[in-house]
């Protein structure tokens, strides 16, 4: 679905929701407060007035007890901490605190009232209708692995960035984006695509929110609530704030400049200092006290830094990057002589990144509603632009381009509490989300790309080797549109004795995409030295001969049933089962020749149903040593023990079939050209600049039979037993005071067996070694000497193929595994200090993973072996300190130290002739 159509749908949906139901208070986490009010003789008190006041927003909700003395209050935007007031005619008023201490699904507010001294005549009380307000059910999970993100641990420049917020937590690794793409994060050594992000429980495809939005964000790796799924790594939860009875107006201006930054001369020479200006704000408050609220936030910013390239970098910067100034000067002279543009047509001296985002919520929870109905309308949007995308010593400015992206969404939510005779109470929560995004890149020049290896003698006597790119970009001329429409409903049943909360959750979502993933359409040349570039002796030339334009869609659904069983006031057990499924709208076009040659069905689309059972518990024991701060204040437990085990199932992305759709091996599929050595065409850079259509579509000799010419198509498809990644994971956690109550400690042990990890297997690889290299430990080479270009050493892989009619025939498999073990320790002061606050964390991680030989250059590419993962550091220490100076300035200091990250030098290119 085109993004413009999505925008029209979003606008229409927003208008429809606005007119069909008022945009009302529906908050992000439903706190269900239930209780029974009795007298001293344990007789139920009917018609007692119960009032709950949130401590954070001063929002009030009220209810009347029924004939059995029972009441229910479902609280919008609950914070888990309330002051309760109970009043009844003839009884003394009682005030007490109700607080979530161990992730309780139901907050119990039972009370026993004593009679007043004055005896009154009997009064008949007829219970009235109770009023209830409702909110989204997103309370902390029983596992204890859900950790809130502290705003103080994220720098002002990164505030609101989802990946940066997640990476501020111990045990989470930031995965920086490339070529203008958004960054991601990794947990337990797993890839970022195994994570999921939600906004108020619905799928969220954005990368950031305004920093002043005041969102509540958390990361969970092992939630035992089966209504939460769609990931095998972690789930990052964003909960948009509701307004409250306080009117708030906030503006913030963040300015960062090189004069405020410290670095060494080398970093200064490479342009690593930057200027950042960002303006943000928040408007929040009540439309009607206790009933309707609004919350709107925004952010606009620009980040810029000097564009340091070969054209303007000082000698210090060049030498630091491994290139001598004379080598850089020689390269520039060669490029000018060949008519290759060095800079964009419009001169650029700085690299800019512009961004903007908005987030707003309208809430309504009418006090007079007989069902406690609550409504909410949330909208979000963001836009960003980077120009140029790249910009470094390894790339000429003209080789880059611009990238622009924007996304938006609207979300409507409704919830209501109702009762059905003997079945006690039900809470229904519904969430409908519509979102869309667009991303596109535009290169500065439409011409072939070139890469040259520059070898320099550096002043310290060492040799520096750098690869420099020039010409046109091979990957920026593409675009992508995504759209998503999702529905989530959770129906909760509460037993009369408040021992059980059974949840039935259903989800349905349709994701669609339109992509132009055309890359290298005008070809790319590689040169092994400046002399080769000067003389036009390219080592290789490759080109994609046809565009990669595709579209598709996927429908995903889920149903789950779970129970939160309050065995006692101290022990809660949570268990359930979740079923996920996916179905792609269409599969790749069948190539019958593949079935004949390889016994493979390339038209298969991995549509599956997955089952995920989970079991967790939370046990609190003893009583805390705190002295109650006021009458009715709750005293927490001595400590809380949590744990459990479960299956966490990821779901494939809608674009999963992209490569299989493009690479069927048919004449209508993507075609390519690869030339090595003497078959590389001659270059006419200035002619290609004015006439891109003249770029050669054949190798120099015009033949297709030479071992150094390859026009055979690639093939990609999925094995019949392919399944999405999943993890079997368990944890055990202890949390409580230590050192005579001076500190609070948290100890968590996590073990995860990560199944169905992806890997490709080339069915067209013959596997016969032509010779071995004794000087490299007998490393095998899979092509004969005659298929290795003597001038460059590059190999032509045709000789390693079972069927030369095809190049790589990659079967996507999911038969690899990894194993994650993690110990997490956290320490913070027990007592509150208005001046000084701090916390300290340590994480020990041991992650091992399987890999197939196609990912390396040693042994048989088809073999599978275990290795330590490079994605996780062995040790991590994280600290945060904040100090209040004179009640005027608060300074935060956050640090993250990692050690033990494995590093293995890699080889670029195909050096063993397996074609990869």
Predicted regions and their residues:
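A short, solvent-exposed loop/turn motif at the edges and junctions
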Residues: 55-58, 81-97, 171
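Short, acidic Ser/Thr/Gly-rich low-complexity loop/linker segments typical of extracellular
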Residues: 55-70
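Periplasmic N-terminal accessory/gating domains of Gram-negative outer-membrane beta-barrel systems
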Residues: 66-68, 92-112, 121-242, 257, ...
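Transmembrane beta-barrel strands of outer-membrane/channel proteins
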Residues: 127, 251-257, 296-302, 377-383, ...
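Transmembrane beta-barrel wall of Gram-negative outer-membrane proteins
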Residues: 272-385, 403-429, 433-434, 613
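Solvent-exposed loop/turn elements at secondary-structure boundaries
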Residues: 449-451, 462-465, 593-811, 916
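Gram-negative outer-membrane beta-barrel transporters
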Residues: 582, 746-905
């Amino acid at each position: 679905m085109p993004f413009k159509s999505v925008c029209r749908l979003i606008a229409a949906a927003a208008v429809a929701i606005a007119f069909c139901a008022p945009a009302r208070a529906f908050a992000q986490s439903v706190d269900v407060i239930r209780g029974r009010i009795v007298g001293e003789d344990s007789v139920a008190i009917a018609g007692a007035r119960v009032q709950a006041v949130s401590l954070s927003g001063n929002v009030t909700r009220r209810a009347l007890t029924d004939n059995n003395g029972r009441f229910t209050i479902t609280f919008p935007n609950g914070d888990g901490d309330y002051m309760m007031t109970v009043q009844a005619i003839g009884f003394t008023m009682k005030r007490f605190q109700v607080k979530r201490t161990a992730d309780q699904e139901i907050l119990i507010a039972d009370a026993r009232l004593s009679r007043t001294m004055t005896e009154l005549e009997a009064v008949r009380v007829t219970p009235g209708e109770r009023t209830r307000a409702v909110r989204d059910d997103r309370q902390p999970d029983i596992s204890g692995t859900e950790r809130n993100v502290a705003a103080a641990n994220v720098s002002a420049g990164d505030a609101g960035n989802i990946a940066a917020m997640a990476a501020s937590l111990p045990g989470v690794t930031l995965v920086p984006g490339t070529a203008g793409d958004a960054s991601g994060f990794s947990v337990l050594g797993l890839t970022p695509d195994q994570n999921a992000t939600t906004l108020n429980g619905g799928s969220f495809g954005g990368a950031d929110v305004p920093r002043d939005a005041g969102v509540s964000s958390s990361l969970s790796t092992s939630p035992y609530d089966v209504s939460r799924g769609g990931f095998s790594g972690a789930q990052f939860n964003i909960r948009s704030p509701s307004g409250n009875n306080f009117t708030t107006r906030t503006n913030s201006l963040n300015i960062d400049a090189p004069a405020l930054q410290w670095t060494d001369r080398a970093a200064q020479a490479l342009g690593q200092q930057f200027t950042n200006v960002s303006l943000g704000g928040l408007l929040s408050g009540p439309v009607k006290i206790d009933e309707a609220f609004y919350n709107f936030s925004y952010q606009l910013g620009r980040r810029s830094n000097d564009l340091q390239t070969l054209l303007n970098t000082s000698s210090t910067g060049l030498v630091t990057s491994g290139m001598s100034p004379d080598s850089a000067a020689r390269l520039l002279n060669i490029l000018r002589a060949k008519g290759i543009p060095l800079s964009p047509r419009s001169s650029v001296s700085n690299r800019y990144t512009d961004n903007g985002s908005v987030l707003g919520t309208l809430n309504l929870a009418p006090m007079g509603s007989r069902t406690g109905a609550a409504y909410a309308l949330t909208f979000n949007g963001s836009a960003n632009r980077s120009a140029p995308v790249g910009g470094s010593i390894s790339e000429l400015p003209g080789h880059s381009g611009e990238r622009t992206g924007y996304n938006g969404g609207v979300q409507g939510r409704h919830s209501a509490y109702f009762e059905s005779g003997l079945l006690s109470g039900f809470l229904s929560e519904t969430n409908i989300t519509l979102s869309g995004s667009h991303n596109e890149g535009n290169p500065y020049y439409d011409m072939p790309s070139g890469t040259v290896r520059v070898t320099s003698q550096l002043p310290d006597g060492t040799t520096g080797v750098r690869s420099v790119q020039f010409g046109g970009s091979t990957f920026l001329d593409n675009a992508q549109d995504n759209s998503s429409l999702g529905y989530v409903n959770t129906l909760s049943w509460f037993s009369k004795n408040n021992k059980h909360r059974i949840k039935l959750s259903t989800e349905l979502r349709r994701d669609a995409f339109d992509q132009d993933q055309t890359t290298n359409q005008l070809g790319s040349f590689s040169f092994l030295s400046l002399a080769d570039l000067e003389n036009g002796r390219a080592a290789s030339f490759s080109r994609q001969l046809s565009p990669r334009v595709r579209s598709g869609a996927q429908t995903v659904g889920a149903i789950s049933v779970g129970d939160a069983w309050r065995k006692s006031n101290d022990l809660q057990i949570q268990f359930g089962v979740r079923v996920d499924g996916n179905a792609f709208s269409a599969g790749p076009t069948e190539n019958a020749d593949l079935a004949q040659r390889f016994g493979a069905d390339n038209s298969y689309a991995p549509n599956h149903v997955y089952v995920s059972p989970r079991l967790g518990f939370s046990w609190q024991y003893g009583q805390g040593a705190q002295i109650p701060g006021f009458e009715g204040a709750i005293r927490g437990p001595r400590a809380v023990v949590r744990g459990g085990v479960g299956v966490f199932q990821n779901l494939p992305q809608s674009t999963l079939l992209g490569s299989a759709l493009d690479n069927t091996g048919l004449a209508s599929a993507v075609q390519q050209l690869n030339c090595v050595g003497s078959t590389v065409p001659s270059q006419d850079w200035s002619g290609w600049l004015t006439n891109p259509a003249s770029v050669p579509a054949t190798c120099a000799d015009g033949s297709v039979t030479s071992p150094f010419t390859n026009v055979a198509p690639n093939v990609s498809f999925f094995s019949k037993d392919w399944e999405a990644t999943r993890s079997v994971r368990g944890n055990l956690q202890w949390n409580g005071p230590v050192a005579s109550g001076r500190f609070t400690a948290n100890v968590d042990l996590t073990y995860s067996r990560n199944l169905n990890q992806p890997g490709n297997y080339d069915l067209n690889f013959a596997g016969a070694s032509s010779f071995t290299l004794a000087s490299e430990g007998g490393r095998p080479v899979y092509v004969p000497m005659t298929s290795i270009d003597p001038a460059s050493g590059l190999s032509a892989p045709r000789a390693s193929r079972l069927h030369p009619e095809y190049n790589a025939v990659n079967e996507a498999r999911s038969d690899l595994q990894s194993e994650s073990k993690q110990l997490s320790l956290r320490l913070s002061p027990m007592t509150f200090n208005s001046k000084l606050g701090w916390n300290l964390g340590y994480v020990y991680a041991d992650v091992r993973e399987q890999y197939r030989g196609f990912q390396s250059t040693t042994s048989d590419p088809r073999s599978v072996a275990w290795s330590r993962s490079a994605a996780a550091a062995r040790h991590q220490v994280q600290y945060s300190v904040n100090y209040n100076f004179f009640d005027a300035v608060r300074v935060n200091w956050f640090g993250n130290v990692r050690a033990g990250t494995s590093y293995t030098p890699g080889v670029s290119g195909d050096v063993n002739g397996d074609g990869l």
